[in-house]
Amino acid sequence: METPSRASRLAAELAADMAQLQADGRLRLLREIAHGPGALAEWQGRIYRNFSSNDYMGLAGNPDLRRQFYARYPDAGSPELAQSSASSRLLTGNTPACSRLEQTLGELYGNRAAIVFNSGYHANIGILPALAGSGDLILSDKLNHASIIDGLRLAAADFRRYQHLDLQHLCDLLAKCRSGYRRVFIVTESVFSMDGDCADLQAIARIKREYDAILVVDEAHAVGVRGPQGTGLAAEQGVMEDVDILVGTFGKALGSTGAYAIMEPEVRQYLVNHMRPLIFTTGLPPVILNWSDFILRKCAAMDAQRRRLMDLSRMLRGRFRDRGLKTGGDSQIVPLVVGADQAACDLAQHYLDHGILVFAIRPPTVPRGTARLRFSLSAALSDDDVNLAASL
């Protein structure tokens, strides 16, 4: 009998693992979804109202903005529309478009230094390992994003996770541990992606000052949506001066691709020399960088849309509460917590049957027993769209 090849044995073992995931109702699949104008999406031949996108400000799905952007470049062959930088930034991939975008970001955030990354994941797996080493401690909110958790694991520093938004637990850890470490980093999201709740950054800033810590805030779900000119929750709460490193993304409310961080010039220069996901990757293409610069300037003036988005969020959350449903948060992310995995899947199907595109979020993305539907609202949704979602 012929011995199976290593490749076929691997395939069989992985297939068995996938079969178990499917039996548990947790098999993940890639869905082909076409994004239409506004908050519409097409899936499997049907048009849906999209409540699952991170296009919070409706910018990514706005064809008029795309036309305005491309009208700035009459020559389609312009190097400003190039689809590749063809190099890492430390070689020849640091294009004029990249420098302009970083200048725009720096000006938006009070003339601090800015640096652009290929994604938020790149930023979060690179910043902490570059800055935090042996003899340092990282204290991270327990519900921080997986990319932050991966960054903790890659860093040579010790790390502890404090209970979600439990600042007394954070203080207890600092009181116990601070004296034994050179540097201590406090890392939190501002708006949390699964619960839609917000960190009390004013209180965290006071703790940071009391214990001489370094504060890193991931504003992925707040930039574009919160704060003056969409600069985030730290600016809204008046604590930008206390944030040592602010991480933002272009891939959500700002309708583009990539990420950025705001910091002091010395920190930026250190990252350029030590941050591996920045050093060892091809830079973003000029067309994306120019689009990000264009959209960043547009979004800064969209205070009316930001107010509308918060109004829609309060409307949906309030309607759920009026019906006795379990929800929470204080942002454009509105969770509807169901509990059991299959019940969440069944409810998601019910919404799909009524033209609402929203999916079940299950473990391990959320804790066991807290499967939910995660409604990501967009300023492009209508009142009728939200009323329909609230009534099903």
Q: What does each of the following model-derived ranges do?
A:
Residues 71-119, 313:
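Conserved N-terminal alpha-helix of the aminotransferase class I/II PLP-enzyme fold
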Residues 307-314, 321-355, 369-370, 377-379:
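Conserved PLP-binding catalytic core of the aspartate aminotransferase-like
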Residues 127-146:
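Conserved PLP-anchoring active-site segment centered on the Schiff-base-forming lysine
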Residues 160, 164-217:
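Active-site phosphate-binding strand-loop segment of PLP-dependent enzymes
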Residues 13-83, 213:
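N-terminal "arm"/small-domain region of PLP-dependent enzymes with the aminotransferase-like
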Residues 229, 235-270:
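Active-site PLP attachment segment
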Residues 1, 61-63, 67, 71, ...:
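PLP-dependent enzyme catalytic core of the Aspartate aminotransferase-like
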Residues 283-302, 308, 312, 322:
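Structural motif of enzymes handling amino- and sulfur-group chemistry
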